[in-house]
Amino acid sequence: ETGKQYAVHCRKKGSLDANEEVILDENELAKGQKYFRIGILSVSPNHKLLAYSTDTNGSEAYVIRIKTLETGELLPDEISNSSYSFAWANDNKTFFYDQLDDAQRPYKALKHILGTSVNQDPTVYEEKDARFFLEIYKSRSEKLIFVSVESERASEVRFVDADHPKGEFTLIRPRENDLLYSVDHHGDRFFIVTNENAKNFKVVETPVASPDKEHWKDYLPYDPEVKVDAVDAFENHLVISERRNGLPAIRICDLKSGETHEINFDEPTYEVSLDRNPVFKTGIVRIDYSSFITPNSVIDYDMVSRRKELKKEAPVLGGYKKSDYASERVFAKADDGVEIPISLFYKKGFRKDGTAPLLLTGYGAYGISTDANFSSSTISLVDRGFVFAIAHIRGGGELGRTWYEDGKLLKKKNTFTDFVSCTQYLIDQKYAAPKRVAILGGSAGGLLMGAVMNMRPDLFTSVIAAVPFVDVLNTMSDPSLPLTVTEYEEWGNPQDPKYFDYMASYSPYDNIEENQYPNLLVTAGLNDPRVSYWEPAKWVAKQRKLKHQNRILLLKTNMGAGHGGDSGRFDQLKEVAMEYAFAIDTLHASSRPESAKQLLGR
């Protein structure tokens, strides 16, 4: 709502014309808190109870509460130290939830019955291998509850009948090294996305009654050029989330005819994903879409008629016109000849003459894809003459599993050299001025910032590193820290000399030299469970010891937040404003937005 920092969650009964009922006002819960974030938000099957969880310091250890929606009363049941997963059984009194271990890994699934002591909750599954994270979820069909555990290299999924929560969980397939799978339910069968004999994953099916591997069979032909990310089952259709040619894609499969088709999107670069879509018996799938130019949009897609209906496009203040802006996709050549996609955004009238300031971002880790989405904050930059760009470097998932694997472990340096190649390409092609390049990355993207700054300090004018993972060797040598053991399969285990030596060769903290480095803005969160605050602090301290006086070097520590920074939307905007002001100031860019007419020189 206008003027409020946090969301207000509402519902209407039966029709959008019905009266609106507020089920949870985050602003009320956040009063008196410096930090506030909702984790789970789940209404019981009979619509009478609301389970929600809160984090009030940024540590990502949530407290679960149950609210009676008819009266607003909070039940006495209260569960601490939970993560992000939860599922109601269909009896409306039993639910399953996770717990964190000392390293803040969700490792245990428990069952609670309302009105009973939390201390007596039985454990339904405990994952003892520290490489695996646990997740609990309920099928869209509302028939089954799943407990899934997954590492970087293996998966294992169990299920129980949601109508009979006292039952035992059934294992679908035991874990195997280098075998990943995820599951959705439809009637008497499971649809499974797996990489078994399919590097970029495929869709298989198996009977619920006998789900073991002997009964797995391909449902759709495997296409090695397409990365399958997820499958969502509806009554008469499968919705398959994919990546094609480096871009997100959605494919629809008619379960009766077997016919498939893609949903088409026209822009050269964009972001698209499925909305929550809780209803199983429907022919409509709701999609979230945006691009550099198109604001966040909610689209209903009719899977039978193949028609799109725009339900809502987020309003943009300040007289925003899509026609004033342009985006494109270009490719830079890496050191080994591989072509790296770059998404570009600028104002129409932009002159490709090598004088523009550039803000280039990147991530390149965990197989996560960084797609072009809408940000009114980014509009403020390009209105000042900036080119904004995303480098889709190896280590991310944009171009499939191999793209990811070629940027991890003993190939991690590809991520860094790819980013350098993208920067040099944009300068050579005159998208940017040689001395007006700012780069931005957070967390594992902050590692990227530190590594490329060491490799090519001459290439960048300014660096913005948000909660950066920069003390790689030290952090990965301490198994008591959150994420260390689970991420051996991402970075390697430094107890092995080959991984120790390789990490030592790129870890930003360990490779600082007495050099003329770029201007640097670093942020940290005191309660950050993923990148401890001391990592960026000691990185900055070491640089200050060797600092040249004609360079700006700033560290801002948020004393009341964690990995994601401030929680309120206005406070988040202030953080972005600080980062962008740093880029504008250090690149000597215009402090005032320019009109398209000014950019065109008329």
Predicted feature locations:
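Hydrophobic beta-strand positions that form the internal "hydrophobic ladder"
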Residues: 47-51, 95, 145, 190-192, ...
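Beta-propeller blade termini and top-face loops
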Residues: 61, 99-102, 106-114, 121-123, ...
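Core domains of intracellular innate-immunity/apoptotic signalosomes
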Residues: 66-90, 114
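Non-catalytic accessory segments flanking enzyme active sites
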Residues: 1-42, 53, 132-185, 218, ...
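Structural WD40 beta-propeller signal
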Residues: 44-46, 89-91, 139, 186, ...
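Active-site-proximal cap/loop segments of hydrolase catalytic domains
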Residues: 390-602
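A flexible loop/linker signature enriched in serine peptidases of the S9 family
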Residues: 1-7, 30-35, 54-63, 78-82, ...
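Cap/lid segment of the alpha/beta-hydrolase catalytic domain
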Residues: 23-44, 52-61, 70-75, 266, ...
